[in-house]
Amino acid sequence: MDIAIRGGYAPNERVQAVRLMDNEFIPVAAPDYLASNGTPMHATDLRDHQGLFFRTPNGPHPWMCEENGQWLDVSGKALSISNNSTWLRREAVAWRGICMTPRWSVQEDLDSGKVKELLITPKVRITQNKNLAIYLLYQKQQYSVPKVKVAVDFLVSHIQSQ
């Protein structure tokens, strides 16, 4: 494999990692869901709501917040758990519950009003690590290969200019 695009944390030094963009997860829900169930204002209010959770190999991403120097699990009741983020986003649009999803993946639905970003305090996260991003990865020695250099340079300039 010449190049890869990965969401998460910066990998180790064995590969070259170029940060393309932030991968901030935000809580969203359909306006009709919020009208029927109320809009959570504080992170702990999420515990009373239906949750749409993304599953990783280690299990569902919890919803967490930092309050008074401690991390709290504020996860809602698990209505659906899936490793298909597109399906989870569709469930949120269909008024099923609250979903923590990357901003870039739901931006079109936010712009159209299909979902609303929940402005909750303190800020809700899926991890204690605040440096989630989308990275372009390649082997350091591969950059000298013309096709890899052209692809890397194009992707970096195209994505970072948006």
Would you name each region that the model predicts?
Residues 17, 43, 106-107, 152:
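Short amphipathic alpha-helical segments and helix-helix/interface helices
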Residues 73-119, 123, 136:
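Hydrophobic hinge/microswitch elements
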Residues 1, 111-114, 130-131:
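Short secondary-structure transition/capping segments
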Residues 1-82:
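Acidic, Gly/Pro-rich loop/turn segments at junctions of secondary structure
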Residues 121-162:
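A late-sequence structural motif
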Residues 44, 85-86, 149:
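Residues in well-ordered alpha-helical elements
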Residues 29-30, 102, 139:
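A secondary-structure boundary/capping signal
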Residues 61, 108, 125-127:
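Generic structural signal for helix capping and beta-alpha/helix-loop junctions
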